[in-house]
Amino acid sequence: HYISQNPSYLLPNIESNDITSNLSSQSRYILMPLAQGIETTDNYRDTLTIQNILTTSDSSYSKVNVENMQTMEKESGDIDGPFHVGVAISEDLEDDKQTQIVYYSSETLFNDNMNTMVSGANFELISASVNWMCSNEDGSTISISSKSLDTSTLTIPAADASFWSIFV
């Protein structure tokens, strides 16, 4: 899924977990321009837990030769998806301690313009990620929510835009 007319502006699938429960239940979109797939190894410590937060669709693909790219269409040699573009990693340590890391593969996830295009959902995801990493056993969390007076932007994936353009 991507923004209409711009296949590099991804609208990844939001996987259901502690970080994304609020976003996935509200059918929100996350916008990740120029995201790269995160490759996880099959061979890692038993104490690690890796959860997918954001994934691309089954029809996604990764361009191999971006510097000499002539088209955004899929070409032979391009890598088939789906890809993970956001992951949460946790590890249980001694003395009931835990390490928690969240990694997103697009720095523009933090961009104000990208956040506005999805009516604040990107910043909600970042806030939920920080909240997950900072939560502790007594249940205290971080809350940075604010009420925006901005207007909402209607985000329409490319397939839906093509469908509705027939009627307009």
List each model region and its residues.
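Acidic, S/T/G-rich, low-cysteine, solvent-exposed domains in lumenal/extracellular/periplasmic regions
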Residues: H1-S140
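Short, aromatic-rich amphipathic segments at membrane interfaces
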Residues: T116, S143-F167
